[in-house]
């Protein structure tokens, strides 16, 4: 009985398991993949740029996407933390965070631009800016700037950081956050 309680406790309080319904995170995570998250983020472990986060749909993002699954959870890469200014000139230009252009080739789907459209967002306290790795097929923060939440995810809606793929068996392995991509980006203090 004790082993069952331990497993149940771990599942409820430490780890989450999620099925991936869309191609918004290709080629990092494919449709049908299943991932494990740690529920220890954002507390007590701090979120970092590059983390692959699972979060509650902040402003009904899935409503206009013709979603066929019945989950209100999304998975994207964390790009902007509170205080960050995230911008892009569009048309293949790199994403720029706090004045530093970042090279996302380590995780962007091959052949996909960082963003076709231009944008500039300063992330307020308590919010996050997220993007899919397959930007051509991702309704992420860029696509929801007029949703009432300005396309930003409340930190409290984050359910965990994905760190491992457990299905399909031929793709079992660790997921990389590619924190090194963001190493030169300075930290900014958020405003309310």
Please identify what each model-predicted range represents.
Residues 13-19, 27-192:
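Soluble "head" domains of membrane/secretory-pathway proteins
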Residues 1-13:
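Hydrophobic membrane-insertion alpha-helices, especially the h-region
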């Amino acid at each position: 009985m004790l082993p069952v309680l331990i497993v149940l406790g771990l599942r409820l309080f430490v780890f989450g398991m999620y099925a991936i319904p869309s191609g918004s995170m290709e080629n990092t995570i494919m449709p049908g993949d299943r991932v494990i998250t740690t529920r220890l983020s954002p507390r007590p472990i701090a979120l970092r740029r590059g983390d692959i986060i699972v979060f509650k749909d902040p402003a009904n993002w899935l409503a206009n996407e013709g979603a066929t699954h019945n989950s209100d959870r999304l998975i994207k890469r964390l790009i902007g933390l509170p205080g960050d200014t995230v911008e892009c000139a569009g048309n293949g230009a790199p994403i720029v965070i706090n004045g530093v252009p970042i090279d996302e080739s380590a995780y962007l789907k091959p052949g996909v631009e960082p963003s076709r459209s231009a944008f500039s967002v300063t992330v307020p306290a308590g919010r996050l800016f997220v993007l899919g790795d397959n930007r051509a097929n991702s309704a992420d923060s860029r696509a929801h700037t007029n949703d009432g939440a300005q396309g930003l995810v409340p930190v409290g809606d984050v359910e965990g950081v994905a760190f491992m793929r457990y299905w399909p068996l031929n793709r079992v392995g660790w997921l990389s956050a590619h924190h090194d991509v963001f190493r030169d980006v300075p930290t900014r203090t958020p405003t309310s």
